[in-house]
Amino acid sequence: MVAVTEQTNVGKITQVIGPVVDAEFPSGKLPRIYNALKIQGKNPAGNDVSVTCEVQQLLGDNQVRAVAMSGTDGLVRGMDIVDTGAPISVPVGKVTLGRIFNVLGEPVDEKGDVDMSLTSPIHRPAPKLIDLETKPKVFETGIKVIDLLTPYRQGGKIGLFGGAGVGKTVIMMELINNIAINHGGVSVFAGVGERTREGNDLYNEMIESKVINPDNPEESKIALVYGQMNEPPGARMRVGLSGLTMAEYFRDVNKQDVLLFVDNIFRFVQAGSEVSALLGRMPSAVGYQPTLGTDVGDLQERITSTKEGSITSVQAVYVPADDLTDPAPATTFAHLDGTTVLSRGLASKGIYPAVDPLDSTSTMLQPGIVGEEHYNTARAVQSTLQRYKELQDIIAILGLDELSEEDRRTVDRARKIERFLSQPFFVAEVFTGSPGKYVTLKDTIKGFQMILNGELDDLPEQAFYLVGDIEEAKAKAEKLKKG
């Protein structure tokens, strides 16, 4: 959505090179950086044209250079271009729930218009330091493996690493569901430069798992903003900010806890790099834009907790050529509070969620934040699993019988822990047939302590697979015994 101010300031297009448009305005009436410019009407060939651009550079001689948010097909020199007098603005509030928007805040789901009476500009300053919630607070997700080993920070940023088909989307949907039910919060999903098919699949899966209610969209738990792979770089570069602006309204005005999903944060950097090259800036390392740190910082610094509410962000991170030293992922890492790494090995064993308990990290896992009991339990779980990993070569060559009694006991407990880290999800009920389980942090810690202490050594390991808390595992063991 682009609001046009009363006094229209009209310029003329002087040059069009791909998605970059140069325009000349009357003397003393130059638009500001980040203002939206609108080109609407018919071109000389008689075709309808409607393009929105964003001012990126002031060139001198009353000329500005802008980047288009949609295709520039049909634009010609001499066409009128209107300065709207404000940045791109998107609708905010309840009207956004259950709907799909593009970078300009226009609905693209063919479900009718959206009430545009309440909008917000996509360029805003980050919250002031005095307004921030500085005391670290754990964000309980109800997912055992995350809450125990990689606790999320309320208002923190988590990187989600994983290849195709290991369950990133299902974890995202479960988090959306749990925040709505247990925190009274809402979610915003920003699809940045990913496949259109994936965006469509995600929308349909969310309807199937009741995260979106198509009959009454305002009862939905999420708003979706897409700028997909086929869009011009301007749209891909700004769609993350459009999603973030919707999330900020829920945090600042509705005082809610919000989950912001960004898929994929690398594409945001990639689009910035394309725009930078189109604007003629000198590239820096590996061809990225010289403003890489600033671009990422401007987005990430707005994702935070204030004293009123929080935005907790889960960002899928694509690592080009698996090179973690590449400037794009390396710059992103500096802003992350935790990493959730999904393992194909665990997924192939059928252990879902396939979160790698040894590779995933969190800055929250400190005794001063989570408490001694939680910290010691998490570290004991990790050391047991690490020992099991070290013994696997010996087991593969010589078999279990060649291990010492202590190592056999460690392997037995590690296998139970591995299975107990799995959990039935609410959003996967339609696929698994098992009712979803939300496990409190207290119950999670108690369950793993009992396994580590040897209190459950006599229970079969399959009793721990796809259950909620430890009481359910005991009940499953009884059931297995009776056959």
Curated annotation (Swiss-Prot):
Membrane topology: Peripheral membrane protein
Keyword Phosphoprotein included in the entry's annotation: no
Keywords, comma-separated and alphabetical: ATP synthesis, ATP-binding, CF(1), Hydrogen ion transport, Ion transport, Membrane, Nucleotide-binding, Thylakoid, Translocase, Transport
Record flagged with keyword Membrane: yes
Gene Ontology MF terms in the entry: ATP binding; ATP hydrolysis activity; proton-transporting ATP synthase activity, rotational mechanism
Pfam families: ATP-synt_ab (PF00006), ATP-synt_ab_N (PF02874), ATP-synt_VA_C (PF22919)
Catalysed transformations (reactions): ATP + H2O + 4 H(+)(in) = ADP + phosphate + 5 H(+)(out)
GO cellular component, one term: plasma membrane-derived thylakoid membrane
Main location per the UniProt record: membrane
Family per similarity comment: Belongs to the ATPase alpha/beta chains family.
InterPro entries: AAA+_ATPase, ATP-synt_VA_C, ATP_synth_F1_bsu, ATPase_a/bsu_AS, ATPase_alpha/beta_chains, ATPase_F1/V1/A1_a/bsu_N, ATPase_F1/V1/A1_a/bsu_N_sf, ATPase_F1/V1/A1_a/bsu_nucl-bd
Function, as annotated: Produces ATP from ADP in the presence of a proton gradient across the membrane. The catalytic sites are hosted primarily by the beta subunits.
Enzyme type, top EC level: translocase
Location in or out of the cell: Cellular thylakoid membrane
Protein's UniProt name: ATP synthase subunit beta
Superkingdom of the source species: Bacteria
Subunit field text: F-type ATPases have 2 components, CF(1) - the catalytic core - and CF(0) - the membrane proton channel. CF(1) has five subunits: alpha(3), beta(3), gamma(1), delta(1), epsilon(1). CF(0) has four main subunits: a(1), b(1), b'(1) and c(9-12).
Record organism: Rippkaea orientalis (strain PCC 8801 / RF-1) (Cyanothece sp. (strain PCC 8801))
Enzyme nomenclature, EC number: 7.1.2.2
Gene3D superfamilies on file: 2.40.10.170, Bovine Mitochondrial F1-atpase, Atp Synthase Beta Chain, Chain D, domain 3 (1.10.1140.10), P-loop containing nucleotide triphosphate hydrolases (3.40.50.300)
Residues annotated to bind ATP: G162, G163, A164, G165, V166, G167, K168, T169
